[in-house]
Every structure is written in C-alpha cells, then in structure tokens.
Amino acid sequence: MLSKEVVELSKQHSIIRDIFEYGMKRAKEVGAENVFDFSIGNPSVPAPKEIDETALRLLKTADPVDIHGYTSNAGVLEVRENIAKSLNKRFDTNYTAANIFMTIGAAAALGICFKTLVDGPEDEVITFAPHFPEYAVYAQGAGCRLKVISADTRAFQINFEELEETISEHTKAILINSPNNPSGVVYSRETI
C-alpha cells in the first residue's frame, strides 16, 4: 500500500514540468538548437575541462572500489578537507572537514536539513515565491509546514515586511534560493 500523502503530492500539477515536456516535444519538431529550455534547470554549460580530466584520470588509475563504493555518511574525508580549505581561502572562514556534509544533490541536502531541524508538525520552514514546487514535498516529508512569502513582483526580491510577520516561534528555517528556482532572479547584495 502506498502512502496516500505521497500519492496526492505526486498528482499535483507542475507547470514547470509541463513546459519541460513541451520543450522536448518542440525540440523533436523544430530541432533542439531552436529551443531554449528555461524550465527545470538542466545545466547547459559544460563542466570545466579539469573536472572531466580528473574524472577520466581517476577512472583509469584509482581502485574501482574507491570510485564506485560507498563512503562514510558525511562523504570522503579528503574531499571534505579540500572543500573546507577552498571555502576558507575564498571567504576567510575557519571551516574544517567536520563542518562539511556531502550529499548526492540539493534534494537530499534539503531533506536531511529539514529532518534535522524539525521536531514536530507545528514546526515550519519559510521560503519565498516563486519557489521550487518540491520544497513542499521536502517539508511534508520532514513532518512540518512550508510557509511561502509572497513575491515582490516589482523586482522579485525578498518581501521583508511579510517575512517579519510570518516568522514565529515555530519557524525552524528560512530557505533562501539564489539564483531563485524557478525565476532565475539573483537576490541583490542589499537584499542578502
């Protein structure tokens, strides 16, 4: 038997997915080079060549178990150490590997964060419209409510007045996504 809650969530309409499907259909009809897909955020810029070169080198030289096997829950220690060093160098911080928790993507990271912060159904996570529709799924999966702050439709920056009114003793997190998904807006330095 499937969870009724998840089944209902899966039935919810997503205009973003509709646009993506339409774009794929049009690409077959008129050629992919004539369709600009601004829907689901698939990367359109290749990774730096150093990434490709390193991946190929590791595939040829590293132990296959190291490449394809499981890691510790937080991720490979050496990688987390290097990420901490990079952050410290670029942003003048003092992170260590203990501050870095690697996941397989943003969805997993948000799910883990929500589960870590949420303690009961009265808890809430706040985000800003427009927002990635699956944020509601992550909040529901963590057992809390997602509160959505209306968009400032002039510039799509954060509506601080409504944010202040919405924050309560039940607020566990405020999810800020910049560049915003789905609008693509980057919050200004003043907003941040």
Where are these regions (language model features)?
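Conserved core of the PLP fold type I
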Residues: V65-I192
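N-terminal small-domain helix-loop-helix segment of the aminotransferase-like
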Residues: L2, L9-G105
